[in-house]
Protein backbone atom coordinates (compact mmCIF):
# COMPACT_ATOMS: atom_id res chain seq x y z
CA UNK A 1 0.00 0.00 0.00
CA UNK A 2 0.94 3.72 -0.30
CA UNK A 3 1.23 3.94 3.49
CA UNK A 4 4.48 2.00 3.41
CA UNK A 5 5.95 4.04 0.57
CA UNK A 6 5.11 7.31 2.31
CA UNK A 7 7.03 6.17 5.38
CA UNK A 8 4.04 5.87 7.70
CA UNK A 9 5.02 2.24 8.30
CA UNK A 10 8.49 0.93 9.27
CA UNK A 11 8.28 -1.64 6.46
CA UNK A 12 8.16 -0.71 2.74
CA UNK A 13 4.71 -2.11 1.98
CA UNK A 14 3.47 -1.84 -1.61
Curated annotation (Swiss-Prot):
The record's account of how the chain is modified after translation: Ile-14 amidation is not necessary for insulin release stimulation, since the synthetic non-amidated peptide shows the same activity as the amidated peptide.
Its biological purpose: Peptide with unknown biological function that may act on skin macrophages to produce a cytokine-mediated stimulation of the adaptive immune system in response to invasion by microorganisms. It does not show antimicrobial and hemolytic activities but stimulates production of the pro-inflammatory cytokines TNF-alpha and IL-1beta by mouse peritoneal macrophages and does not potentiate the stimulation produced by lipopolysaccharide (LPS). The peptide increases IL-12 production in both unstimulated and LPS-stimulated cells, but it does not stimulate IL-6 production in a significant manner.
An example Gene Ontology CC term for this record: extracellular region
Residues modified to Isoleucine amide: 14
Expression sites by tissue: Expressed by the skin glands.
UniProt keyword list: Amidation, Amphibian defense peptide, Immunity, Innate immunity, Secreted
Protein name in the entry: Frenatin-2D
Outcome reported for the amino acid change (mutating residue 1 to W): No change in insulin-release stimulation
Amino acid sequence: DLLGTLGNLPLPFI
